[in-house]
Amino acid sequence: VRQLEHLENTFYREAFTSFQLQDFLNVGFDEEFFLNLQFIAADESAHVDFLIAAIQSAGVAPVQPCQYNFPVTDVASFVTVSAILESIGTSAYLGAAPFISSREILTVAASIMATEGLHTSLQRSSLGAIGAPNPFVTVST
């Protein structure tokens, strides 16, 4: 999940250097959706900061972010990839849960997983889909 959070954080940071509010308005998204995506970006940054601090406090060197090449050429592709990444994020945390032995870390991971699920639901709803179409999240391991 550390690499996933780095990936999501980098994805949003790069996208918001390329796309501004007007770009979203031009393709039919409203300002509220744009602002929600910015809040999601801030959440992803906070997740990275938390995970780095937790890993360092355990005496382990955190994984460094990779170089990424996102298939984003316009707002529509940004929104599509964003929704996919958030869905993967939710299932990745669920898949990692059995490997977390610390109750404290598991609680925080569950909190982040819930936030990732809210991100997914928001994006799906904004795209005209059902926010939570299934009663259970598919586990990624």
Predicted regions, residues:
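All-alpha RGS (Regulator of G-protein Signaling) helical domain and cognate RGS-like helical scaffolds
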Residues: 1-141
